[in-house]
C-alpha cells in the first residue's frame, strides 16, 4: 500500500521551514501532497494561484511531491487524495495547543486518518510566513527564510 501524507497550510508565502518539513517527509512517505488552502478568512497576501506557484517553485527538486490548492474540509480533501496521514509542523510549544485541537477534530471527522507532527530544523524554528511578510514590508532581507522566487514575489508585490 502506498502511504500518502498531506501537508496542509496557507503557505503565505512558503518558507524554508515549510520546505524543510516537506523534504524530510519525502523520506518517510511514498507521496507528499502539499495542500495550499484557499483560507479566505485569513485574507492572504498572495492569492491561491500565486501561493501554489511559489510552493511548486520552492519544492521543484523533490520527486515525490505534488502541490495543489484546495478549499473546504481537510478530511474530505484527504479522502479525495486517498491519503492516510496529515502532516503538521510544530515550531514551538506555543503551536502545540492549536495543533492538538485540530488533530482531535480531524480524528473525530475521519477516524482513519493519523496526524503526524514534525519540527523544522533549528535554523527555521522561529520562521513564520507572517514574520517574513513583516520583515519584507519593512525592507529587511528575507533571503535566508524563503526561496529566491518568493523573495522576488515579495519585492514585486511590495514595490
From Swiss-Prot:
Pathway: Cofactor biosynthesis; coenzyme A biosynthesis; CoA from (R)-pantothenate: step 4/5. It catalyses: (R)-4'-phosphopantetheine + ATP + H(+) = 3'-dephospho-CoA + diphosphate. The record marks 18 as: Transition state stabilizer. InterPro entries: Cyt_trans-like, PPAT, Rossmann-like_a/b/a_fold. SUPFAM superfamilies: Nucleotidylyl transferase. One of its GO terms (biological process) is coenzyme A biosynthetic process. ATP binds at residues 10-11, 18, 89-91, 99, 124-130. Its EC number is 2.7.7.3. Its cofactor is Mg(2+). One of its GO terms (cellular component) is cytoplasm. Reversibly transfers an adenylyl group from ATP to 4'-phosphopantetheine, yielding dephospho-CoA (dPCoA) and pyrophosphate. This is Phosphopantetheine adenylyltransferase. It comes from Thioalkalivibrio sulfidiphilus (strain HL-EbGR7).
Amino acid at each position: 500500500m502506498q502511504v500518502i501524507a498531506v501537508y496542509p497550510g496557507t503557505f503565505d508565502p512558503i518558507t524554508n521551514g515549510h520546505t524543510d518539513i516537506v523534504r524530510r517527509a519525502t523520506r518517510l512517505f511514498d507521496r507528499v501532497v502539499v495542500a495550499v488552502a484557499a483560507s479566505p478568512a485569513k485574507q492572504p497576501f498572495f492569492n491561491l494561484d500565486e501561493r501554489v506557484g511559489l510552493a511548486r517553485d520552492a519544492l521543484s527538486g523533490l520527486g515525490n511531491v505534488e502541490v495543489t490548492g484546495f478549499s473546504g474540509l481537510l478530511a474530505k480533501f484527504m479522502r479525495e487524495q486517498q491519503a492516510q496521514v496529515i502532516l503538521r509542523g510544530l515550531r514551538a510549544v506555543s503551536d502545540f495547543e492549536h495543533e492538538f485541537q485540530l488533530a482531535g477534530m480531524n480524528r473525530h471527522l475521519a477516524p482513519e486518518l493519523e496526524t503526524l507532527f514534525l519540527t523544522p530544523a533549528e535554523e527555521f524554528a522561529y520562521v513564520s510566513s507572517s514574520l517574513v511578510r513583516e520583515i519584507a514590508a519593512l525592507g529587511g532581507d528575507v533571503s535566508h527564510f524563503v526561496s529566491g522566487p518568493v523573495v522576488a514575489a515579495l519585492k514585486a508585490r511590495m514595490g
